[in-house]
Amino acid sequence: MENFEQREEQKPIKKKGSVLKSFIGWVVYVALLVGLVVGTPKALSYILKSEYPMAAITSGSMWPTLKTGDMVFIQGIQSRNEFEVGDIVVYKNPQGFTIHRVEEKQKDVVITKGDANNTLDTPVKYEDIIGKTVEFRGKPFKIPLLGNISIILNR
């Protein structure tokens, strides 16, 4: 019994200051996390000149270059001269957005195709193309699996 009593006496008593310090630490941590979640897309939007600076790959149409769940970064496009055949572009369509490779540039439209697809897409008007993927060493810069978070949250 005496041993038990000694243990209880040795328990440190938390001071009000340490609880407050811990609480403030958590508040700062949460504020920084919220700042990153909100601020990163805004900063990327400004840097990349794109309303949509990041995109999650939601299908296998660009396999093996881009896989479902990859996160890619989108550089905004202001004119038809800012991309060429072979670039991967993002364009608006009635279902949302599509990320496919440019196969051909014609006078009024662009012909695209997913790398894993056998057929060409419906021609895309130049004004519907909003950007192209950011490249690093000649390949799309992507973060594997990070896009899965967006895919899950948008279900």
Sequence positions of predicted segments:
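Protein maturation boundaries and topogenic segments
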Residues: 1-79, 140-155
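Short beta-strand-centered aromatic/proline hotspots
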Residues: 57, 88, 98-104
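Structural motif
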Residues: 69-71, 84-87
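Hydrophobic beta-strand signal
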Residues: 72-73, 90, 130
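Short, charged beta-turn/beta-strand-edge "cap" motif at the junction between a beta-strand
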Residues: 77-82, 94-98
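Short beta-strand segments that buttress and anchor functional surface loops
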Residues: 88-92, 112
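Short coil-to-beta-strand transition motifs
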Residues: 92-100, 122-125
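Extended, hydrophilic extramembrane loops/domains of integral membrane proteins
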Residues: 103, 109-147
